[in-house]
Amino acid sequence: MDSEAVSSDSHVAAAIATRRRSNSVSDDYSVQRTNDDATQCKYFATQKGYWKDEFISRFANSSSNVSEARRFPEISMGYWARTAAIEKYVRDFLNEFDGNAQVVSLGCGFDTLFWRLVSSGAKLVKYVEVDFSSVTSKKIRHILKPIGPNSVDLKKSFESDAVVSHHADLHAGNYHLIGADLRQANELDQKLATCQLSHDIPTIFIAECVLVYMSADSSTALLKQIVSQFKQPAFVNYEQFRTSDAFTKVMEQNLGDRGIQLHGLEMCESAEKQEERFRNAGFKEVKVMDMNQIFNNFLDQKEVSRIREIEMLDEMELLQQLFAHYCVVSARI
C-alpha cells in the first residue's frame, strides 16, 4: 500500500510501496519506481481474488515477483479497502448527478478506475488524470502498446482517437492524461485547460497518498485553487492518519532510507487537522473516517466478509493497526 507501514515489531514493516511526491525533479525516478511497486502489489491482490481488474495487467509486469513482505494478507486487504472506498465515493458521486459530472484524479499513477467505471457502464462527462510527466509518459506507453493475446485494448474505452502531445499528455474525448506538478498552479491551470473541463458542472477530485508529500501551504493552495475555479467541487483524500506515534516514526524511517520526505505530515495528525485544512480552503462539509470505519461501516459488508475469507488472518490486530493510521477525507463546498 502506498506509503503504508506498520510498527517496528510487525512483519509488514518492510512492505511499503509508496507513490512519493517530493520537491526535487531528481525524485521523479523514485516516484516512478514506487508507482511500479504499488501496481505490482495491486496486480498480486487481484490475482489472489480480492477484486476484479482486467486492466491492471496492462500496467503490471506479470513476470516480476512481488516481494515476500508485500504478499502478506494485510497488504492486499489494505489495497482492496482503499480501492473499494475510492471507487464507491466516485460511483456515488456520478450516480447523484446522473453522470453529468467530471472526475479529476490527482497523482494518478497507474490507476485503472477510469476503465473500471466505463466498462461497467458508468456515465461521466470527462475523466482527467494528473501526475508527474515522468509517470504520465510511461502510462501513455502502456496504454498505446500493442495488445497481447490475453490483454484488453484500453483505447476501446475512449470516445475518440487518442492524441498524444509532448510525450506526456494524452487526450481522447472523455479521457485525458496530463503531466503536471500539482504545486505549480499556473502549470496545472494550463494543462487542465487543454482538457476542456467545465467549471460549472459537479466535479470530484481524488487524491491517494498525494497531499502528504506536499507542504501544508502547497496542499492548501491546491485546495483553494480548486474551490475558486469550480462551482460544485467535491474532494476525496486518502492518506496517513494519527501520525504522532511510533507507527509513523517507523514509516518515516523507511521512507527516509529511500530519500523521501513527508512534507505534509503535520496535516495528518488528527481529524481536526484534516478538517481545518479543508475548511480553510473553502470546503464547508468535511468528514473524516479512518480505514477501520471505512472497512466496518462504509464498504459493502458482504464484500468485506468475502475478503476476510480469501486469506484467513490468525488475528486482526495488525490489520486494525494499519487501518487506524490511514483515513479518507470527503469534502464539499
Curated annotation (Swiss-Prot):
Keywords: Methyltransferase, S-adenosyl-L-methionine, Transferase
Reaction(s) the record says it catalyses: [phosphatase 2A protein]-C-terminal L-leucine + S-adenosyl-L-methionine = [phosphatase 2A protein]-C-terminal L-leucine methyl ester + S-adenosyl-L-homocysteine
GO biological-process terms attached to the record: methylation; regulation of mitotic cell cycle spindle assembly checkpoint
Transmembrane segments: none
Top EC class of this enzyme: transferase
One GO cellular component term: cytosol
Gene3D superfamilies assigned: Vaccinia Virus protein VP39
Residues bound to S-adenosyl-L-methionine: K42, R82, G107, D131, D181, L182, E208
GO molecular function, one term: protein C-terminal leucine carboxyl O-methyltransferase activity
Family of this protein: Belongs to the methyltransferase superfamily. LCMT family.
Function: Methylates the carboxyl group of the C-terminal leucine residue of protein phosphatase 2A catalytic subunits to form alpha-leucine ester residues.
Annotated protein name in UniProt: Leucine carboxyl methyltransferase 1
Organism of provenance: Caenorhabditis elegans
Lineage: Eukaryota, Metazoa, Ecdysozoa, Nematoda, Chromadorea
